[in-house]
Amino acid sequence: MPILLFLLDTSASMNQRSHLGTTYLDIAKGAVETFMKLRSRDPASRGDRYMLVTLEELPYGIKAGWKENHATFMNELKNLQAVGLTTLGQSLRTAFDLLNLNRLVTGIDNYGQGRNPFFLEPSIIVAITDGSKLTTANGVQDELHLPLNSPLPGSELTKEPFRWDQRLFALVLRLPGATAVEQEQPTAVQFDESPITAMCDVTGGRSYSVTSQRILNQCLESLVQKIQSGVVINFEKSGPDPPILEDGLTDPVRSVGSQPWHSCHKLIYVRPNPKTGVPIGHWPIPESFWPDQNSPTLPPRTSHPVVKFSCTDSEPLVIDKLPFDKYELEPSPLTQFILERKSPHTCWPVFVPNSAKYCELGHPFGYLKASTALNCVNLFVLPYNYPVLLPLLDDLFKMHKNKPPLKWRQPFENYLKTMPPYYIGPLKKALRMMGTPNLMPDSMEYGLSYSVVSYLKKLSQQAKVESDRVIGSIGKKYPQETSIKVRSGSNALSLALRKDFKQLLQEITGEVPQRPMDLNMKEFAGFQIALLNKDIKPQTFRNAYDIPRTNLLDHLTRMRANLLKSTRQFLKGQDEDQAHSIPIVQMGNYQEYLKHIPSPLRELDYDQPRRLHTFGNPFKLDKKGMMIDEADEFVSGNQNKLKRTGEPNMQGVPKRRRCMSPLLHSRPQSPSVINNHISGKDSPVSVNQVLCDLPKPVAVHKNTDMSNNVAINEATENHVADHLCDDLLITKSESFGTLPNAALEASESYAAGGDSNFSPNDTSDVLLDKTRESGDTESCLLNNNTAFVHRKRRLHQCRSYEEANIELKAQILKEIRKPGRKYGIIFTLLKDVQGDLQTRLLFLQHVIKEATRFKKRMLIEQLEGFLEEIHRRTNQVNHLSSC
């Protein structure tokens, strides 16, 4: 997955205009968009990651990093402005640090254990600048200097700020301000002479001098082709040149002095596996030092390994089943020289200096060889010191039949002593693939010392913290200056040079009274001039000069509407649709809106499931985790069809038994006796004596067909407990098992009165109608006052127990939501429910409904049994009263 980082020059010099009429910054923005369009033609561009860095100070210069998406990248690119200095060196260091942010965490660099070309993160930095002088706060610089100190942990392990899979390319804009008279000839794009060119060469890239729009497009196409997966290596010749050419003659031109192919700084292509899409390798490139187990630290390595090649022709060694790595070299003078020799069957061994323990040049770890078709040069990477190992392995498989004798083991053990310890792991894996897993002892120590491993782990943790900090700081806007500090333009003169110096002396000595000091606000030390805040809209209703000329008529209409409106409404400074108008581009930017809203308060109930943000449809939820809100969805369709219209709203309970209570069926002609509470199954019925007599309510006959819920509510309000005398106290500790004598007496009075289906709100009206029929006006007024007293008493009792029931309901619902099957607390809380029987029955039905929503089957069955026990007790009381 290539990383494409664009470093755009946002200094003030980018505001200059070319002959096309556009500024350099606009040309740079267009170049980035053109590059992305050209890159999108390649199917491999799906995994590209784009980053954007400018010349602003850290962290404001990082516009798009590791977490920002493509939309954020394009938005930040369009909003760039050319202001500030040309701090190109600091911005380049910021770009490299941004790319190296996660390398210690992922372990790509593999410090101290060899360089693995197949562990890479290919990155290309495209810098677009105007090539002007490098200006900083300290002055103008002629050379490009990158800061040596870096806040990134582990930066001391590498000498350079970049890595071997990171390359820098620069587009230096040299477009003239006037149109060229002569037509330019199509030639190769030249290197630029700006200070950034040297930095490009060091990283393995190059610079382009852009003098026209045609050359710019040509450079962009060339850059797209440069996106290759690979690492940069320094190839240097070791030893004498090859003396003989293919025709047997020496080349006098090439034999004199240093040639370009003697030292090349080029890329080797690391091709990804077609099946997995990830490069696969077996052998590392050796380190330039011999690892010491007693060393507490690691020596810093160079970004690009120095690989020496010897011009000695040798036969390429390969044996069966031994894995090797093959990398193609980028075209260079070295590859051209090797191909011109036309010797595809010979190779040149390669070394890494100081990689061996006792040899300065080191032992060969591979070789350079031209392809059979003579169209490219490949680097073959084999085990370290392969000229010794491969013959031993060949003898083991062919002569000893995979059974090593003692005579064979002695040279093999000597080879292991000359091999760097970090090759033990890859060699064990290769021998396992070849069928000899037990050839090397498991007791061999390889790797790094304990102190070095601890040091690398500590650096990895610090790098993770720094990575989170940098990623969190990306996207912050540069703090705007609210004022301009005023500085004195001239230095203050000494008091001795002032014209009134003598008078000042007399004032000091007291000969002359002191004059009041004249304060000049322009010379005040902390004087500042406020700047206009662009985020605050001008209050046009305060200052008429803030109204744009094109909006005068609209503003006049709005002022007239505010004047004619009622004073109760608020004055509006803008239209209603204008307050909610937003560009279409920003309508879907929901994440940006969430960043600016304040953090929500903590939940009052931690056990309550949190509602996730569903942008778009607020009712869009995952069906797997959605709670059933309607009880009908929990019952099968046959049960819904067989539902009777006279039954109560108790849907949603599985295996539902028919309820035998007459209170929950259609209203009978003879009212039933109502009890207060039943504690549970098999509880004895205790009778409490009530000391006061109960007044009998006036019988009212109504022939109306009402639903069961209305009937239950009316029965609740018409309970006999509402007519108890003042000295009767209904305590909170009543259980469902108590059945007072007041209920028995009430049943007799209700039976005598006939139908008891009336509402307490209609009590006064009914009594008034009765008295009107009898013609007794005084009795009418007396009964009306009595009814008003009873209604007031009922309202007071309702307020007393309803508040307690609300608290109990919240506690019970909280217990229902908890996981597990411990429901003892729920039944304990149900005993504390206050109110008459119907209030408690409705409360219990609501609890069953909530248990149905959360699919608490065991709790539903227990609550149903609890409810049936209440109905059974009630029927027993009704039977006794009828007898």
From Swiss-Prot:
Name listed for the protein in its UniProt record: Integrator complex subunit 6-B
Keywords: Chromosome, Nucleus
The species this protein was found in: Xenopus laevis
Chain location of the short sequence motif Inhibitory loop per the record: 626-633
A single BP term in Gene Ontology: protein localization to chromatin
Biological role stated in the UniProt entry: Component of the integrator complex, a multiprotein complex that terminates RNA polymerase II (Pol II) transcription in the promoter-proximal region of genes.
Lineage: Eukaryota, Metazoa, Chordata, Craniata, Vertebrata
Keyword DNA repair among record annotations: no
Pfam families (UniProt xref): Beta-barrel_INTS6, INT_SG_DDX_CT_C, VWA_2
Note on domains (UniProt): The inhibitory loop acts as a regulator of protein phosphatase 2A (PP2A) activity: Asp-629 and Glu-630 residues mimic phosphoserine and phosphothreonine residues and bind to the PP2A catalytic subunit PPP2CA active site to block substrate-binding.
Cellular component aspect of the GO annotation: chromatin; INTAC complex; integrator complex; nucleus
Gene that this sequence comes from: ints6-b
Subunit relationships: Component of the Integrator complex, composed of core subunits INTS1, INTS2, INTS3, INTS4, INTS5, INTS6, INTS7, INTS8, INTS9/RC74, INTS10, INTS11/CPSF3L, INTS12, INTS13, INTS14 and INTS15. The core complex associates with protein phosphatase 2A subunits PPP2CA and PPP2R1A, to form the Integrator-PP2A (INTAC) complex.
Family: Belongs to the Integrator subunit 6 family.
A single GO molecular function term of this UniProt record: protein-macromolecule adaptor activity
VWFA domain mapped to chain residues: 3-227
Domain of life: Eukaryota
Subcellular location: Nucleus; Chromosome
